[in-house]
């Protein structure tokens, strides 16, 4: 038996690609993770950037019957054009059905005969053919009431059909109005104004490597009880040899400490601490360039106007995670309020001091981390903003500005810190 014939038919790689699997070995510097890195196999997204799930259902038994059994949900989920077409056809069908019934009643009662040979009152006045019966059906169901045609007491069947058509018309109207209102008020449309950053970043936060991404709300109306979740999705082979194409692993974003619940008034950076329980614990910057996984991020909450739960989704592939970057500030204090500049929402800047090793190596080998007092890009913006406010205040008072005391003090403090890398603002 050849190697090709022994290949697993359910494997995600071919027999030619089987040799590209990662093998373990010790690193040359003793701090490696024991992997030889090969090219990354391109994978399809499970969740698209706009939140849609990249799936297609196939070979579903009795799909039409199951969808028709839940007609209301089907009408809400389908496109507007199809929903309006369905209701238009429903109205036409009911008008035609009752028009035919009124026409049959008129024929059976002899109302279509000439007036000279007819010696009794017709069931429906002014109905002399099918077109007149159809118009009477429309007038009855829509309560137009032109006054030319009306049912008489001559035929109880005609009276009963008028009552039945009125009930059917109310049912169709109620169903249509309910479906349209439910479709217009769907909370998933609220997700269009909830924003995720284009990239996620990995950087140090309080001395620990953290995975971070940013979320924002483009409306002034709040998302009540907003909370976030995240999952890492990647293929996995169990110890028994079972292949799981999309294994879902929860990523902790502070559930135990309540950090997953956010007050989403301004853009917030969501934080996942890469610790021993994290699926990213053994991933370094080099691994990130070759690994194959997807991180699905979910934001849930209630719409303030309707109290209905909405959910916004996005995802980050491994090549969309920037190692050693931080997000640029978007919140600035301006006069008596705070200003949010969304032009910086997706922008990041590089932090050269970020370790390139994994969090596991960082813990085990205890790499030296930069001082907590190191000069930071956000700190520089804060100092510059304060200097501008001081200049404006002194110009307004008509006094000459003081010497650049704060800036000199800043230069003196920053010069005392010997850094082997460039300042973040110079990147």
Swiss-Prot record:
Q: Where does K(+) 3 bind?
A: 144-145
Question: Where does the entry annotate site (Role in the control of polyamine-mediated channel gating and in the blocking by intracellular magnesium)?
Answer: 173
Per the UniProt entry, the disulfide pairs are 123-155
Q: Which residues lie on this side of the membrane: Cytoplasmic?
A: 1-77, 184-427
* Binding residues for a 1,2-diacyl-sn-glycero-3-phospho-(1D-myo-inositol-4,5-bisphosphate): 79, 81, 183, 188
Its assembly, as annotated, is: Homotetramer. Forms heteromer with KCNJ4. Can form heteromeric channels with Kir2.6/KCNJ18. Association, via its PDZ-recognition domain, with LIN7A, LIN7B, LIN7C, DLG1, CASK and APBA1 plays a key role in its localization and trafficking.
List the protein's name.
Answer: ATP-sensitive inward rectifier potassium channel 12
Lineage, broadest ranks: Eukaryota, Metazoa, Chordata, Craniata, Vertebrata
